[in-house]
């Protein structure tokens, strides 16, 4: 069953765009950069105005992993509050306002999970800035500011989308060409080959296509050493973007968005004891 989504609302959601940008930048700061690049960061993320084609496969209750993740976060917040009871920061207020004692979230009748097939060939784009370092005739001889735009991203995957405790969870499960999909009954089996995995599937690629355009000063466009480094950086970015999706967003990892507002109270839909 196919259905439409309000893509315009999603693409204009500042919280969503900020979360994705922060997640990407957090990943970039955790990796070792090659010697020819410095200060690599995501400057802008745009969802684009062309939505993916989404086909609903199954509707089920959320998997237990999502509840465990929320409860672990709440437990950590409670411990931080105990250690710093005089601290009136956001984390402490959030725990108090939710009226949590045992820091446990239980399944609610309003919780829902969708298994969807998602095919995307839109105009999403990611703008990246960096400094191209020239190490000749000496180390770090010159640093050139450059801007790279990642676009024409295409993928066709099976995804898990869950709504619970005012949070949205999103995870890539596998490519639609994966032979594991021939065993439909085992897709959402928590003891099956997909959800029981403790690491990302080595065979999942997610991204089927993408392109990168690079802006560099006109005075360097004919410089062979600069162009060679630009080519290496573009290939490096492609590999790291694919690694990011596999390690940070593909099961058993996910990206989640918290829609909890401080003014919410114990009338929340979910049962929190």
Swiss-Prot record:
InterPro entries: Mdm12 (IPR027532), MMM1_dom (IPR019411), SMP_LBD (IPR031468). The keyword Endoplasmic reticulum applies. GO terms for cellular component: endoplasmic reticulum membrane; ERMES complex. GO terms for molecular function: lipid binding; lipid transfer activity. This is Mitochondrial distribution and morphology protein 12. The SMP-LTD domain is a barrel-like domain that can bind various types of glycerophospholipids in its interior and mediate their transfer between two adjacent bilayers. Its main location: mitochondrion. GO terms for biological process: aminophospholipid transport; mitochondrial genome maintenance; mitochondrial outer membrane translocase complex assembly; mitochondrion inheritance; mitochondrion-endoplasmic reticulum membrane tethering; peroxisome organization; protein insertion into mitochondrial outer membrane. Residues 76-98 are annotated as: Disordered. The gene is MDM12. It holds the Pfam family MMM1. It is found in: Mitochondrion outer membrane; Endoplasmic reticulum membrane. Coiled coil: none annotated. It comes from Vanderwaltozyma polyspora (strain ATCC 22028 / DSM 70294 / BCRC 21397 / CBS 2163 / NBRC 10782 / NRRL Y-8283 / UCD 57-17). Residues 78-90 have a biased composition (Acidic residues). Component of the ERMES/MDM complex, which serves as a molecular tether to connect the endoplasmic reticulum (ER) and mitochondria. Components of this complex are involved in the control of mitochondrial shape and protein biogenesis, and function in nonvesicular lipid trafficking between the ER and mitochondria. MDM12 is required for the interaction of the ER-resident membrane protein MMM1 and the outer mitochondrial membrane-resident beta-barrel protein MDM10. It is a peripheral membrane protein.
